[in-house]
Amino acid sequence: MNISRREFARLLGAGAAATAARPALSLARSTGAPANSLTGAGLVRLSSNENPYGPSARALESMTSSFPIACRYPDKNADALVDVLAELNAVEHGQILLGDGSGEILKLAADVFTGPVETDHEGTKGGALVVGDPTFEAILHHAKVNGAEVVKVPLNASFAHDLDKMLTAIKAGLVYICNPNNPTASITPKKQLRDFIAKAPDDTIVLVDEAYHHYADSPDYESVIPLVNEHPNLMVARTFSKVYGMAGLRCGYCVAQSSTIERLRERQSWDSVNIMAAVAAKASLEDADQVRNGRRLNSEVRAFTVAELDRMGFQTIPSQANFIMFDAKRPVVPLIATLKSRQVEVGRLFPAMPNYMRLTIGKKAEMESFLAAFRQIVAIAPA
């Protein structure tokens, strides 16, 4: 069916208005499992650590309002977003770089700071990438494409980054620390991370990925953005894909010293953040309920899910994110496939932990669907 732009705007505007009329903005929407042709009718999608409650009503309204300026490049709107981010993070405008999701930030970091080590009249370029194992794999891919050496350091017994061993493994280049970590949802304690950043060599960039920052409530966790001005080799990545519910819009950012930002900007495409993403991100930052309610709903449903798994005899790594990782007591690859055949999509295999399953925390009805399917499967084929 073909619809005009006017009709499309009317439909989206009606949806935003309906959302705004509901209590607690978008995060108080129905908790039923989705049955939408755009996502797959009846598919319970618990595989990508998305926010099932979606963007805030203010973000939806801002997107609708931005339709008439879709003919314009996003420079002014992007600058307005950077201004807000700089103020929120107590840094200068030139210390923020927007990205097409935080994924673009990770790629830029790999492009600039990793690769075969070469020395010319401008100095030494390239370097190795040091990461925890397991962790989010995207930056490993980018570094390998660049021809860089990738050094994997296993997580410690608490599923935190083993920072002492990572420090020993450092070679000029880049260290990537995802905190809270994906896929384990675990944190690296704040004092250990502060000490690591202070000890890291000047010729090595420390990239801390704080995609799941808003979900972390442990007293042993803190953002390292306040340390950026003290450490020229520190950069921090953030995203609007998680608690802000904008995974499909693609908007993220980096906080670092201005000299680092300029090196990244040289490799970046112009206007990589579209105008809808920019206005929606700015509106999201002005909606305190989005974060507050998102954290509350995630915490409630996560606690329910962990308790049910514990009742079944499956132990979960303590989670500080919008997903969990638990010991399935058997190889997860067959479980992933069998769950998919029952319309439940869970996280992929992480080879360093072949018996552990990563599971996004969806709405309660979605988690009940997962638990029902999982109970049936493990009853048929016990470990």
Spell out what each predicted region is.
Residues 233-317:
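PLP-dependent aminotransferase class I/II
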Residues 1-28:
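N-terminal export signals
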Residues 144, 162-171, 183-206, 210-243:
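Active-site pre-lysine segment of PLP-dependent enzymes
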Residues 338-342, 350-383:
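PLP-dependent enzyme catalytic core of the Aspartate aminotransferase-like
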Residues 22-71, 270:
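C-terminal segment of N-terminal export signals and the immediately downstream linker at the start
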Residues 80-128, 146:
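Phosphate-binding glycine-rich loop
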Residues 155-157, 299, 308-342:
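Conserved PLP-binding catalytic core of the aspartate aminotransferase-like
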